[in-house]
From Swiss-Prot:
Biological processes per GO annotation: regulation of transcription by RNA polymerase II
Upper classification of the organism: Eukaryota, Metazoa, Ecdysozoa, Nematoda, Chromadorea
Entry's localization field: Nucleus
GO CC annotations on file: core mediator complex; mediator complex
Species of origin: Caenorhabditis elegans
Name by which UniProt lists this protein: Mediator of RNA polymerase II transcription subunit 17
One GO MF term: transcription coregulator activity
Chain coiled-coil ranges: 172-197
UniProt function note: Component of the Mediator complex, a coactivator involved in regulated gene transcription of nearly all RNA polymerase II-dependent genes. Mediator functions as a bridge to convey information from gene-specific regulatory proteins to the basal RNA polymerase II transcription machinery. Mediator is recruited to promoters by direct interactions with regulatory proteins and serves as a scaffold for the assembly of a functional preinitiation complex with RNA polymerase II and the general transcription factors.
Subcellular location, principal: nucleus
Quaternary organization: Component of the Mediator complex.
InterPro entries: Mediator_Med17 (IPR019313)
PANTHER family in alphabetical order: MEDIATOR OF RNA POLYMERASE II TRANSCRIPTION SUBUNIT 17 (PTHR13114:SF7)
Protein family per UniProt: Belongs to the Mediator complex subunit 17 family.
Keywords: Activator, Coiled coil, Developmental protein, Nucleus, Transcription, Transcription regulation
Length: 667
């Protein structure tokens, strides 16, 4: 440092008190009620408006109005300002009339003036607080206790409890009496309103307005309703996903004025679109394409039975309908019209099936000479029951498919999935979508099918089930030996399974238990054809031919007859049972038709018996001498001799076999 420079040293405060006073000037006391802001209203846009809470001054003023000052001060205390000098009043008036008062300037009192100001304000706040506490203490709002004062809780006495209960009972009784009076008055007014006697027009308008909003609330539980300006409209569309309130599917809602002759009507009046003001039905049936039914495949152009169209003369009748019926019928018409249009579009796209569309009738080839027929029928828009035509089962299935299609969400939301737990190497585990090529992915992909394609499968299965049921009924009615019974194991839309049970009552006498000789075979029905499956797992494909199904059932019965003959020949009741030389259920006759047979030999080896069971015919029985040595035998001595099956003793196959075996046992 140079000699000419001045050294400025920092000035330290003389004491810490002076520093503290410069930083903190007085004490701030905030006295106000701890109230939350109350909600005044909530707007339609969701904005909440609050009430500004009361300040401490407002709260003190409200409490001060409740204080009886005469009791605190005394009635004889004089009013301090009662004696006022009239000259002072004149001075105040002159000041008020003369003009504005000059602003008073607080004189400076040194560095402690601001501190004195804040202390004075704090003192005023404390004085106000003491006044509030004294008021609340003297009026039993709050009693101050010291630390040493014991806290005692006064328990209510029995007299107090009984008094309180009695008071509560009295108030409850009064409340119930008032409620009874209100209900009685409402009942009287309701009775008067029903008879419409002595009621004012305003009251009737109030009743109609109340009923209108009640029915409108009931309508909103089922239908989509909204208000646009001064109009109330609804939506008839049936789509769950997609566009709502489309113009062709909107109905208007209005209020009608009811009179005495319209008591049963609804106060809500709806106006549906004119193209939907008719009742509809979509009939599905299976018809045969032949000469007899050729004229009934399409409608007669001159027949106006199912071709109803809206007329202006029916507008008054439509208005008198209840809104529940009108909206339900109109939506059903919209649904069936769209479905029939979609089915016709899908039928045109099918390349392997011929289809014809004419006069709201769709014919599409099913199989062989059978056609699937869709007919859209229209009826007047009025109350009454409509007779359901077509196949009821197919109508219900089509309705269920439509509802299922509308309830299906085709766009699946994205979600995380865990990797499968495998024992493959890491390189194979992490292949992801690269595990299959494009051809394999497309082969395994589940493709959506249209309603028409699924209906064709269901209708084909329906026709085949009906055909198999008729065949089973004929088999069980014709065949008495053995007895054939059938029952359904499972029934589905596209696959079903029927079980045939063959029994013979004479087996109980020879075998003892019928369960051991019971034989079954099955009929598997799909949309493509029918196949008969034996108990051994042999399947016979019958396609869609009822004659082949009948033939397969009779063949299974012939196999059962072979089993029955073999079982009876080995029966332990025989002293010398017969021996089975040969049994072939796959044997053929000279014409190449299936003919299961069995060859028996008695114990003495003197006679051979041949049973041949032709399908759909009586069995043939042949007998000849047993061949001991084929080299030395003479053909004329060992020829098969045919026995007349109808002349054998016994009414059933079991009895005839029993009689024949008894006769040839020792010969």
């Amino acid at each position: 440092m140079e000699d000419g420079d001045e050294v400025v040293e920092p000035i330290e405060p003389e004491s810490e008190d002076i520093v503290n006073l410069t930083k903190r000037l007085g004490v701030d006391l905030v006295l106000e009620s701890n109230d939350d802001w109350k909600i005044q209203e909530i707007g339609f846009d969701g904005v909440e408006r609050y009430l500004q809470p009361e300040t401490f001054t407002d709260h003190v003023g409200k409490l001060a109005r409740k204080v009886e000052w005469t009791k605190l001060v005394g009635t004889k205390s004089p009013y301090e300002n009662s004696k006022v000098d009239p000259e002072d009043e004149l001075d105040d008036e002159n000041v008020a009339k003369g003009g504005l008062n000059e602003e008073l300037v607080t004189p400076e009192a040194g560095p402690w003036s601001s501190v004195a100001k804040y202390l004075h304000e704090s003192l005023n706040q404390l004085n106000s607080l003491l006044d509030v506490i004294s008021v609340t203490k003297s009026t039993d709002y709050m009693k101050a206790l010291t630390v040493l004062d014991p806290i005692t809780v006064q328990e209510p006495t029995p007299e107090t409890i009984s008094t309180n209960r009695g008071t509560q009972w009295i108030w409850k009784r009064r409340a119930l009496q008032e409620a009874v009076q209100v209900l009685d008055m409402a009942q009287k007014q309701r009775q008067r309103a029903s008879s419409n006697l002595g009621l004012s027009a305003d009251y009737m308008a109030h009743l109609q307005r109340t009923k209108f909003f009640e029915e409108l609330r009931e309508m909103r539980e089922i239908w989509r309703v909204r208000k646009v300006g001064d109009y109330i409209c609804g939506d008839l569309s049936y789509h769950i996903f997609g566009w709502k309130y489309d113009t062709p599917a909107i109905f208007d809602i209005s209020r009608r004025s009811l009179s005495n002759n319209m008591e049963n009507l609804s106060i809500i009046e709806v106006s549906v679109p004119k193209d939907l003001a008719r009742r509809s039905m979509l009939a599905v049936s299976i018809v045969q394409d032949d000469i007899q039914s050729g004229n009934g495949l399409f409608r007669d152009p001159k027949d106006k039975k199912y071709t109803y169209s809206y007329r202006e003369s029916d507008s008054e009748k439509v208005k008198l309908l209840h809104w529940k019926d009108s909206l339900k019928w109109a939506q059903n018409t919209l649904l069936l019209r769209d479905v029939f249009k979609t089915i016709c579009t899908d039928a045109i796209k099918l390349r392997n099936r011929l289809s014809i569309i004419r006069d709201n009738v769709l014919l599409i080839h099913l199989f062989d000479d059978y056609l699937l027929r869709f007919e859209l029928q229209w009826f007047p828009f009025q109350t009454g029951e409509i007779k359901e035509e077509g196949d009821i089962y197919l109508n219900r299935v089509l309705r269920e498919m439509i509802i299922g299609f509308e309830c299906t969400k085709f766009i699946r939301p994205q979600f995380f999935c865990s990797m499968p737990v495998t024992h493959l190497p890491e390189a194979l585990d992490l292949r992801g979508c690269g595990g299959f090529n494009t051809a394999q992915i497309e082969e395994r992909a589940v493709r959506s099918r249209s309603i028409l394609q699924r209906m064709l499968d269901v209708a084909s299965h329906r026709a085949l089930v009906t055909m198999v049921s008729d065949v089973a009924e004929r088999v069980s009615r014709i065949s008495l030996d053995p007895t054939v019974q059938y029952r359904w194991l499972n029934c589905g839309r596209t696959t079903s399974r029927m079980m045939f049970n063959m029994t013979s009552k004479d087996f109980e006498m020879y075998i003892g238990t019928i369960s051991s000789v019971r034989s079954v075979f099955f009929a598997n029905i799909s949309s493509d054809g029918v196949e008969v499956e034996t108990k051994d797992g042999i399947k016979m494909k019958c396609q869609r031919d009822p004659a082949r199904v009948m033939y397969a059932c009779q063949y299974a019965m012939c196999c059962y007859s072979v089993t029955m003959v073999s079982t009876m020949s080995r029966n332990n009741n025989w002293v010398t049972p017969f021996q089975t030389m040969c049994a072939n259920v796959f044997a053929l006759d000279e014409r190449g038709n299936p003919a299961p047979n069995i060859v028996l030999c008695n114990q003495a080896a003197t006679r051979s018996i041949l049973f041949v069971f032709h399908v759909g015919m009586e069995p043939e029985v042949f007998v000849r001498r047993f061949i001991v040595n084929e080299e030395t035998m003479k053909p004329e001595e060992h020829e098969w001799k045919k026995l007349c099956y109808s002349r054998l003793h016994g009414a059933t196959l079991c009895r005839k076999i029993d009689a024949l075996l008894v006769f040839l046992r020792d010969h």
